[in-house]
Regions:
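Bacterial N-terminal signal peptides
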Residues: 7-18
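Cyclophilin-like peptidyl-prolyl cis-trans isomerases
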Residues: 22-251
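Positively charged n-region of N-terminal signal peptides that target proteins for export
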Residues: 1-4
Length: 251
C-alpha cells in the first residue's frame, strides 16, 4: 500500500526535505525505518507472520462502521505499549477508518517501517500482501485541519494529490504544525506523554534514505522487512479500548 505518496516536506531549521506520502520517497505517509534498538530479526517479528489475517480486510468497502465520538487503541509493540486516544470530531472520516482497521486487526504484526528522528514515525503497510493489495486504492476524502500536527498527534499519510489517505499513519515526533498543517494533514488522535516515551524508543538508525521500499513491503510483506531490516520494531497487536478516560491528555 503505497498510500504515502510523494509529499515533499521542506522541514526548515534542522530538517531536510521530507515527504508524507504513501510512496517510497515520501515522509508523513510512510515513515521509513521505524524500529527500536534490537539485534535479531526474529526478536522483532511481533505476532507470528503465519497467523491468519481477518478476511474482512479484503473487502474495504464493507468496513464502514461509525466510530464512537472518543475511543482508545492500545498498541502493544516490540518496544513497549502506548495508547492512542481518538477524537472523532477532529476528523470523522479518518477516525471511522482507523476504528474499522483496528477492529479488524489491520495493524497487527505491521512494522514501524520509517522513523525519522525529530520528525515522524510511520506505519500502516500490512504484514500481509493480500491485505495491502485490497487497500491500495481504498482512499478517503480529505478533511479540514482542525487540530495541529504537534508532537504526539496522529495523522494519515498521503501524497501531494487530493484524497489519497488510506491506512498509512504517522505520529509526529516534534511540533510539525508549521510544515504539515498547511499541507492538509489532519490529525485525528494523539499519544500521551507517557506513551511517547515508548514511541521515542522505536529504532531509527536506518535513516530516511536507508529504509525499505514501500512497494516491496506491499508485495512481499513482513518477511521482506525481517530479512533486510531486522532491527525494525513492529506492532504485536493494536486493540480497541472501550472508553477513553477523561484523564488522557495530549503530549
Amino acid at each position: 500500500m503505497r498510500k504515502l505518496g510523494v509529499l515533499a516536506l521542506m522541514v526548515m531549521l534542522g530538517f531536510c526535505v521530507q515527504t508524507f506520502a504513501q510512496t517510497p520517497a515520501q515522509a508523513p505517509a510512510k515513515p521509513k525505518a521505524a524500529t527500536a534498538p534490537k539485534a535479531s530479526a526474529g526478536a522483532k517479528t511481533g505476532t507470528s507472520a503465519a497467523r491468519a489475517y481477518d478476511r474482512a480486510l479484503l473487502r474495504p468497502a464493507l468496513l464502514k462502521e461509525k466510530a464512537p465520538e472518543t475511543f482508545q487503541v492500545k498498541f502493544t509493540t516490540t518496544r513497549g505499549d502506548f495508547v492512542v486516544t481518538v477524537n472523532r470530531a477532529w476528523a470523522p472520516i479518518g477516525a471511522d477508518r482507523f476504528y474499522n482497521l483496528v477492529k479488524h486487526h489491520f495493524y497487527d504484526n505491521a512494522s514501524f517501517f520509517r522513523v525519522v528522528p525529530g520528525f515522524v514515525v510511520q506505519f500502516g503497510l500490512s504484514a500481509y500482501p493480500p491485505v495491502s493489495a485490497a487497500w491500495e486504492k481504498a482512499n478517503l476524502q480529505d478533511e479540514p485541519v482542525i487540530q495541529s500536527n504537534k508532537r504526539g498527534y496522529l495523522t494519515y499519510a498521503k501524497t501531494s494529490m487530493p484524497n489519497t489517505r488510506s491506512a498509512q499513519i504517522f505520529i509526529n515526533l516534534s511540533d510539525n504544525a508549521g510544515h504539515l498543517d498547511r499541507q492538509g494533514f489532519s490529525p485525528f488522535g494523539f499519544v500521551d506523554a507517557q506513551g511517547m516515551k515508548v514511541v521515542d524508543m522505536l529504532y531509527d538508525q536506518y535513516g530516511d534514505s536507508g529504509g525499505p521500499d514501500q512497494d516491496q513491503i506491499s508485495k512481499l510483506g513482513k518477511p521482506y522487512l525481517d530479512k533486510g531490516w531486522p532491527k525494525l520494531d513492529s506492532i504485536k497487536t493494536a486493540t480497541l479500548v472501550v472508553a477513553a478516560p477523561e484523564a488522557a491528555k495530549p503530549q
